[in-house]
Regions:
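Assembly/oligomerization scaffold segments
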Residues: 1-89
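Short beta-strand-centered interaction patches in the first periplasmic/extracellular domains
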Residues: 121-193
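A generic structural signal for beta-strand entry/edge sites
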Residues: 29-31, 74-79, 156-160, 310-314
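Short, compositionally biased
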Residues: 69-77, 134, 165-167, 298-310
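Extended Gly/Ser/Thr-rich low-complexity repeat segments
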Residues: 44-56, 91-100, 283-288
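Short solvent-exposed strand/turn elements
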Residues: 78-94, 311-324
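Short acidic/polar beta-strand-loop edge motifs in secreted extracellular
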Residues: 86-108, 118-143, 147, 168, ...
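An acidic/polar, Gly/Ser/Thr-rich interaction patch typically located in mid-to-C-terminal regions
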Residues: 17-42, 47, 182-324
């Protein structure tokens, strides 16, 4: 194991009794929580500061660049919480754009926070008018990604936007074998999915219907928070900003994105086993389950939790959503 603090490996100089790294494919920044035995108050003497850079590596696992967000000395212990998102990402702003493009906005937001921007399959849509009103840059961009059937994540100093359908069409990165030595739980909530979505935003409206839909329920969401199924291990979106649209075509496109956001977590699972450092969020794996073969097939990993001190990993995954 290696723990870098502002570029220096301090692992052998500290007594680490808790180390959990959580990686997310969407809607939540990666977190790293470290707790040290510190009966002599050494950490406070080192004067750690918000924004300091940490990085933890173990085997094939690498947190990438993480920024210190909070610290807490308590009863001979010292706890640090770091995130992949820079501290500046919590700043609320207000701004408007005319004729801005999707990739232009991604590059602008990344630059605002000292990040670089990378795109994986997202269409460079144009927005005649876009408004940010007392919210963070990443909240705005995450909403826009969701409406376009995309998602964003931050890793190692990079803001990444990816089309979910594009990623789901790639080859699997490896195999996840669920055997008798691991604990697994699968959930089938597809009966709660929707057959179509209608978006009405001001004077514009649009509809999208899922191909070969087995459900007839219609989703009429006014915000992101109204277009989601609860996913194990993933916090529910609290985004209640009322949707805006510039045309009927844009409203129909947003309806497609919202329907995907609501339906993609209809079939989920999670698997825990001794530390599995070779797995990361936002990857495709081939699932093989010895005692539940009906669930076998390609899955999308939307969260990975590594407990390095407890020697345990938990992977959260969902089925691929076909057709949209």
């Amino acid at each position: 194991m290696k723990l870098f603090y502002n570029g220096t490996d301090i692992y052998n100089d500290v007594s680490l009794n808790y180390c959990v790294h959580e990686m997310y494919a969407e809607k939540q920044a990666d977190t790293l929580v470290l707790r040290f035995n510190d009966t002599k108050g050494i950490w406070s003497k080192w004067n750690p500061a918000d924004g300091d850079v940490l990085r933890f590596t173990e085997g094939a696992s690498d947190t990438g660049k993480m920024f210190l967000h909070s610290m807490k000395p308590e009863n001979g212990l010292f706890t640090i919480r770091a995130m992949a998102m820079p501290k500046s990402g919590a700043t609320r702003k207000s701004k408007s754009w005319a004729g801005v493009r999707f990739l232009q906005l991604g590059n602008e937001i990344a630059a605002n926070h000292g990040l670089t921007f990378q795109n994986y399959g997202c269409t460079d849509q144009v927005y005649p008018y876009l408004r940010q009103e007392s919210e963070t840059d990443f909240a705005l961009f995450s909403r826009l990604c969701t409406l376009e059937g995309c998602q964003m994540l931050i890793y190692d100093g990079k803001l990444l936007a990816y089309s979910e359908q594009y990623i789901e069409q790639q080859a699997v990165a490896g195999t996840l074998e669920v055997d008798e030595n691991g604990n697994f739980t699968y959930q089938d909530n597809r009966s709660a999915c929707f057959g179509s979505c209608e978006v009405t935003a001001g004077s514009f409206s649009g509809t999208f219907s899922a191909p070969d839909a087995k459900n007839t329920a219609v989703l009429r969401a006014k915000c992101i928070a109204e277009a989601q199924l609860r996913a194990p291990g993933l916090p529910a979106s609290g985004d209640r900003v009322v949707l805006m649209s510039n045309s009927n075509a844009e409203a129909a496109r947003f309806a497609k994105g919202l329907l995907r956001n609501a339906n993609k977590y209809g079939h989920t699972g999670q698997f825990s086993k001794a530390l599995l450092t070779g797995y990361a969020a936002a990857s495709l794996l081939q699932l093989k389950t010895e005692k539940a073969s009906a669930w076998n097939g390609p899955v999308f990993v939307y969260k990975v939790r590594h407990d390095f001190v407890g020697n345990k990993s938990t992977l959260y995954f969902r089925d691929l959503l076909e057709g949209y």
